[in-house]
Structures are given as structure tokens and as C-alpha cells.
């Protein structure tokens, strides 16, 4: 009887393990950490857009879109310059 309960316990643990493994499939696409020419081009386009937006001034106090763009520009500029300084 003890062998039967041990066998059932092991079978239940095995089934539970199989269910958790199948519940979280691996993603089909793994992002590469290498920089491809397309990524470099994309970064250059983003950087040129950042410089374009950075030169813009928010004249109106209620121009929320302008403030959002400038904040985003500042954050992205910090991220890219921080990344470039720590290679």
C-alpha cells in the first residue's frame, strides 16, 4: 500500500510538472543582442528625430503634447548617451 501511494504521489508530481512546462511555451522569436545594420539605421533615424524635437520650444503653457515630446526626448537622449558612455 505504501508503494502504491508513493507511485501515485510521484505520478501526480510528474503531471503537475508537465502542466506547468506546457503552460508557458517559449516565445517563437528571441531578440538578438547584436546590432544589425537595420537597427543602426533605426537608431540613426530616432536620433535625428530627437534632435529635431529637441530644438522645438513650447511657447504655450498648456501645450501638453509639446511637453510630452520634450520629456520623451530627454529620456531617450539620456538612455542612448548613458548606453554609449558605458560600452
Swiss-Prot record:
Residues 24-77, 83-87 form a propeptide. Promotes plant cell differentiation, organogenesis and somatic embryogenesis as well as cell proliferation. This is Putative phytosulfokines 4. The keyword Amino-acid biosynthesis does not apply. GO terms for cellular component: extracellular matrix; extracellular region. PANTHER family: PHYTOSULFOKINES 3, PHYTOSULFOKINES 4-RELATED. The keyword Secreted applies. The lineage of its organism: Eukaryota, Viridiplantae, Streptophyta, Embryophyta, Tracheophyta.
